[in-house]
Structures are given as structure tokens and as C-alpha cells.
Amino acid sequence: MIIIVGGGPAGCAAALSLRKSNPDVTTLLLDDADPAAFKIGESLPADAKNMLVYLSPTLYTDFTKDIAEGVHMPCSGNASAWETPDLRETYAVSNPFGMGLHLDRARFDQCLRDAVAGTTAGSQCTVVHGVFNKVEKTEAPEYQGWIVYVRRYGSGETDTYRAKWLVDASGRKASVARKLGAKTIKTDALLAFHMLFSATASTQHDHDGRTVIEAATAGWWYTAQLPRGRRVVVYHTNDDDASAKLARKQAGFLALLDETKYISRVIAEHGYEAVAEGHGKEPRPGCTAAGSSHLVPPMEDRLTHGWLAVGDAAMAFDPLSSQGMITAMKMGCVVGDALARRLRGEPDVEDLVSQLLRTYIRVRSRYEDEKGYFYDQVSRFTGPFWESKTTA
């Protein structure tokens, strides 16, 4: 058995790719997500559609049905006030893959998990809704591998599972890898503060399907239109910046928002009002880590068994790169296929770790170059935030 901890894009892509490449492998996908909870990370590039087709034609059919029903919104392009105070437009019509999407992220992730659960007629792939508690290695002569302890939602009971390979797709917390001795190396301390806005009875209809990006004195902003008359606004700054303290509360977040030129205009012109991100909650900013990080080591092959990390657990990207979700899914595909071939005993994948490490290093190196390039374009602001981001 292979156990994948994490039911987001990386974990689901790994499960679907593994199933596609080696249908005989028994896989358990452990998911602890709340499908009703709001989640940022809503931008899906247009070329991701090809990957969904590759992973599962049924998945892509369900996804396109959701698009037709308005569950996800088309992204018409980007408008950014970055290196200059003026907005510069990039239109999706010039993209050979077409328009990207602004997702209902919780619904998209659930669609992926449904595809994993529906890939087999028997019990080859199982999705378990529960929380990863701990992992133990066993080197007994009769069984060499891992014992994983899971607390099930609902009953609260603890189940145990055995696996030869573990895939850590648990996100930035890297729950499995860190229990096995790996460490997350953070190269910056970027935070993302986010608030959800909703249309009201007096709201002017919002036809702006762009992602609008705006650099500011101590960070940068973006806004994207979401389904059901909603809009997300996100502010990025370092955790030690004075504005981070302000952004943690609604009044401070809205005051900082008022200082923007374009983002505030989108909200004001359409009459949006701040709303809670969940039922029964007060409208206040959420906060999540958004900096660059990578896991050391990101994998380990113990010959008879092993583990590896994928997605944000292995390497997490600054949202400016717009690489997080698409790269997580691509790496999930690579990992799933590599594990499938390894378990078939193909001779060219004996050194699984070396092959995947080279791939991970290439991905991270390209990302760091691109991130440095984009931040270096901004020279109109001075101060600790921009000094921390420029490479010169």
C-alpha cells in the first residue's frame, strides 16, 4: 500500500497518476479538509486543463460541467500596477491555451478527491476523511515499512494502516516529513492577509474578470472575482512589517486597502461589502504563510520502503509566481508515475531519489530566478519589504 497524506491538488494528482501508471497498486488518500471552508489560492492557469484530461477524463468532464454551471469563473487576464503606477494589461485572448479560471477552490479540491475515490471498481484506492496523528517505522523481518495512525472524523476513533511508501502532501506543515526528521527551510517570511467581499442588493454588476495586482509601500495586493457575486482581496507583506499588525484586524485591513489606487476602486465602484469567510463568523481577515520554503531532505529511499514530499510540503512558492497549484499538480504527476514504475520493478528507476531530487532542484531554481526577476522590477518604493525582496 501507498499512503498519501493530504487531499489537495498535489496529493490527488499523485494518486491519480499512480493509478493511471500502475492500477494494481493499493492506495489510501488521507484527507482532513473541510469542504465547506473558504480557501484562497483560486487562480488556475489555462494549461492546467490538459493535465486534468491526462489525470482522468471523468474528472475533466465534471470540471467542465462545473464551469458551465458558474461554479468557477473565467479569468480574462491580468492587470498590474507593478514597476510603474499605471495598470498594464495582459489579455487571456493572447494565450494559446485560452482563459484561466478563478476557482471556487474548496469545490475544485473536492472534485479532485471525488475523482480519486471513483478511479476503481474495487478497493484499490480509498479516500479516508481523518487526521494524520503519527507514523512509526517497523523493521520486523515479516514486514518492513510504515505504520500510520489516523484519527477518523466523526467517530474520533484511531485507525492504523501499513504502507511501504508514504507521500507527504500535507501542505506547508509537512506533517509526515517533519515527524520523520526532515526540516522546512524558510527563505522569507511573507504573509498573506485575505478578506472576502460580497455583492449586495445595491451592487453594480461586476464584469471585471481580471486578476488585478498592485504594488504598495510595504507589500503588494491582488483581487480576483469569485463565483456567487464574491471577490477576494489579498495583501502580502513580511511578518515583521508594521502593516502586518494592522492587517490582522478588519479596520486595519480596510484602512490599508483604502490606500491602494486600483484595488480599492474595484471594491468601491461595485459596492462590495466585507463578509465572513465562514458561517457564524465575523468579517475579519484571514492570515496564512505565503513565503518561499523547501524541505530538507524532501524524500528518502530505504530500499524496502520510503517516503517523499510533494506540493507545498516539498517546496512552497510566493503567490506572485502563480506557480503553486499548477506546479503542485505537475509534481504530483511526476511522483505518482515514478512510484508506479518503481513498484513495478523497472530497472531505470532504481535510484528514485536521485531522479526526483534533480527534478525538484530544477523546479526550485527556475522559481527563484523568476521570483527575483519580478521583484527586481519594482524600484519605485523603498523600505524594508522591497529591500528584502530585491536580489541586487
Each language-model region and where it sits:
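Predominantly flavin-linked oxidoreductase catalytic cores and closely associated redox partners
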Residues: 115-271
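Helix-loop-beta segment of a Rossmann-like dinucleotide-binding subdomain
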Residues: 85-104, 145-147, 230, 236-239
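N-terminal Rossmann-fold NAD(P) dinucleotide-binding loop
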Residues: 11-12
